[in-house]
Amino acid sequence: IQPNHPDSVKLRFNWNAALAQDPFSDCGLYFGTQFVHYTTDCGNNWKIISPDLTTNDSLKQKQGSSGGLTFDVTGAENYTTIICISPSPHDSKVLWVGTDDGNVQLTKDGGKTWNNVGQKIKGQPKNGWVPQIEVSPHNAGEAFVVMNNYRQNDWKPYVFHTTDFGAKW
């Protein structure tokens, strides 16, 4: 995958970095750092289509000493990164994003604006891990969000459901 990203923008990567195929383009790919990156030419050229979608909590980051990886027991990044990207199969402008610090972000205009719909989820664990968002193949505004909170020794599973693009859960 090329070209190299400009050094002026520091990126945060996760061992479980998000990668998703655009269902409307054979060569369209999404990739997650703290930003959503998008290519229309199978990875030859990339553009950033989002702001930082994480909490960007600097207390959880060790970029200066890790080269972009936040330390955990393994030395891998596990805070303030995107770990899930789920494009809608209904509309090419709709994209759901989950982060490793509890955000569930949604764009309905191809990345021009973003809404942290996760803030509306009652009962979610604070700073939970959002490894999966499953968009309904039948209903445009419907999605299931999976969260976990094992980093806080909370082993309960969390699954949330919306039918209206995250307005209610």
Model-derived features with residue positions:
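Beta-propeller blade termini and top-face loops
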Residues: 1-169
